[in-house]
Regions:
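Fe(II)/2-oxoglutarate oxygenase catalytic core
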Residues: 1-195, 203-234
Length: 234
């Protein structure tokens, strides 16, 4: 993890490189990639990529499960550093494993929970988003438009439920192609198997730079809040 508290975390070796290669190979073999969209529209000057949403496709269920497992493990690590990513949005009460008493979840109590206790709480509040595989072609592809992940769209306002973004780098060695964060003045260099987590809001406005000597492959999605009716009932 980084030393500076900029809320951008990169977890190296989060996914085995062999699995990353399989994702790339299956993506290319599928022939199902389509031009990437921005906010529902096709604007190649803003985003030039070939995309494949694997969620909901039976033939990709194994890969989707493996990726969500890796992301969840990283999410627990992230919330152990940034406790209020979980406890600031929603007041939660749990049974303290030490004495069984009902207590409000605060930073001290969260830190005392092991993964077995913390995991179900996190799953109660958050859910995984649809996973998108993307290819950015050498010297041309990229997402040069400065953007964030949080915006109002659709009757269900699904994008407004996004809390964190994540990107898994599936290959490296192509030069450039960094994920660049505007306000943090930070560039994340792709490294096979590394998993990036960062907030979805405008504070972490970012862009994807063009790869130089080879195609860049990523898997990407979000950690979203569950719907209000799940968390609060009704």
């Amino acid at each position: 993890m980084s030393d500076a508290a900029d809320f951008i975390e990169v977890y190296h070796d989060a996914v085995d490189p062999a699995l990353c290669r399989q994702l790339v190979e299956r993506f290319e073999a599928s022939g199902d990639g389509v031009p990437g969209k921005v906010g529902g529209g096709l604007y190649p000057e803003l985003k030039d990529s070939l995309d494949l949403t694997i969620s909901g496709r039976p033939e990709w269920a194994d890969m989707e499960a493996a990726l969500n497992q890796a992301v969840f493990a990283a999410l627990l690590r992230y919330l152990r550093r940034y406790h209020y990513g979980l406890i600031a949005p929603i007041m939660l009460e749990i049974s303290d494993p030490a004495d069984g008493a009902r207590k409000r979840l605060d930073a001290d109590l969260l830190q005392r929970l092991d993964d077995q206790a913390l995991g179900p709480i996190v799953q109660y509040v958050f859910r995984p988003g649809a996973i998108n595989l993307q290819r950015y072609s050498a010297g041309r592809g990229g997402y040069p438009y400065w953007h964030c992940e949080l915006y109002p769209r659709g009757a269900d306002a699904e994008p407004l439920h996004r809390h964190l973004l994540w990107t898994l780098y599936l290959n490296d060695g192509f030069g450039a192609g960094e994920t660049e964060f505007l306000y943090q003045r930070r560039k994340i260099e792709p490294r096979t198997g590394s998993l990036l987590l960062a907030p979805a809001a405008f504070t972490h406005t970012h862009r994807g730079n063009t790869p130089a000597q080879g195609d860049k492959y990523i898997a990407t999605s979000w950690i979203l809040f569950r719907r209000a009716e799940h968390i609060f009932g009704g």
